[in-house]
Structures are given as C-alpha cells and as structure tokens.
Amino acid sequence: MKCCKVLKKRYVYRKIRNTFRCLLGNLNDKFVKIDFEKINIKELPELEQYMLHKIFNLNTLFKKYFNDYNFHTLYKELLHFCTLDLSAFYFDIRKDTLYCDKLESKKRVLTIKFLNIVLEILLKWFAPVLSFTTEEIYSLLKIKEKGSIHLEKFPNIPSNWNNQDLSNKWAELIKIRDKCNSSIELKRASKEIGSSLEANLKILLNEKLITLSKGTDFSELCITSGAKIDKINDKNSEEIIIETSKAEGQKCPVCWKINTKPCERHLS
C-alpha cells in the first residue's frame, strides 16, 4: 500500500512538472514579465480569453482555500487545471500554432504571451506547496527584482478577465468538441483512421448552435484535417450529429494536415 501511495505521488508530481516543462520549452528562455492590468483582452483569440476566465475563477478559489489552510483541496484544483485545462485541452489545441505557424505570426505571438502569463501565475500558485520546484524554475527565469519566488506576491487578477458569457459559449463549444472526439475515436477503434489528423468532420448542428459556433474552427479544436458545419435536419430532435470520414489528399510535411490542395500555410 505504501508503495502504491509513493507511485501515485510521483505520478501526480510528474504531471505538474511536465506542465512546467511544456511552458519553459515553448518559451525557450524568453520569459517576459507581463503587467496583467495592461493586457488588451480583446486582442487575444477567444480561446485565450476563455482560459483567462478560468484563471480568474481559479484564483478566487485559490485565495479562499489558502486563507482557510485547505491546502489539500487547493492542490487538487491546481492539479486539475494543469492536467485537464492546460495539458489535455489548451496545449493540445495550440501545439499546431506553436510548432507549425511562423514565429512572427500574430496567433503564435499571442499564444507565447499567454504562456508567459500562465507560467508566472502557476509559479505563484504552486509556491506554497511545491517550494523547491517553483524556486528552481524561478531561478531559470533570471528575474532580478525579487530574487526568490517566495518574495513575490500572489497574483492579482484583473476583474475584466472574468467573462461568464464567453464561458457559457465555450461550454457549448466543448460539448460539440467532445462529440467530435468520440466520433473520431470510433473511427480509430475500427482502424479506418490512425491519428485525428487523418479525419475530416461534418458537424450537423441546430440553428442555435450554428449561430453560437460562428467563427469557430473545429478542425483546430479537434485537431483534424478539416471540419465543415451544416444545419441539422429540422425533423431530427438531436442538437448535434457528427459524421467522420477519412481525409483524402496529400499530407503537409509541416503540419501533417491532409488536403487535396497544397497547404496554404506552408506554400513558401
């Protein structure tokens, strides 16, 4: 039993450490301290705005649990954010932007900006429970003003990061994404496709969800080669129907997306 507990703790710690590794690796020693009050929320893509809303809510919980000395629940909330909200969701979606977009592309620049924000906040959140790890990472960032993560103040998150309407919208988009992922997994299980990038999606939605999804790229959210949205048959009582097919064409050697035409992102 003791051995199992030790292995479980190691597994949990590795998850958190891997989150920091991902942040540091993508920032590539170019950490920039950002004034949260001066961030223009509207210039960020919706995905980043949604993640800032989640950070705002988690910071509220962080203060409550910290003041109540409820470190166990605090640790669980932070772990949930690292493993589900960041690793399994945000990083998964944005890895295409980070690895395949040009360094100077606006979306990539704003993604890097968000990673800077997340790294700074995570270090301050985890400092009370992972003191040595956060100090080690902080020393790599070469921030001279304070000299130690434990001399930093807890993050003060601006109120304009809180956007419940956007959160409600993304709750619906994530439901659609989950349905898409389930459909993709069925095709993978039947060996019709390998990775999700071998899939094309046809997403049938009711009128309300079509309006809600306007401007959303589900091929990006679901990591597929293509995604098309269409109106669901009025006689059908379901809100969401997903049809997944094998993508046809040539694989782009950079982003690995499959298309019958040359990849417009990487023509040069």
What is each model feature region?
Residues 1-11, 68, 72-73, 163-171:
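Conserved phosphate-binding loops in nucleotide/dinucleotide-binding enzymes
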Residues 29-60, 91-183, 190-205, 230, ...:
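Acidic, turn-prone loop/beta-hairpin segments
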Residues 252-255, 263-266:
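Short cysteine-rich clusters marking metal-coordination/redox-active sites
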Residues 241-249, 256-257:
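Short, flexible, mixed-charge glycine/proline-rich loop motifs
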Residues 1-24, 76-79, 110-135:
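Structured ligand/cofactor/substrate-binding pocket environments in proteins
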Residues 215-230:
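A glycine-rich helix N-cap at a beta->alpha junction
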Residues 82-83:
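Hydrophobic residues within the alpha-helices of tandem HEAT/HEAT-like
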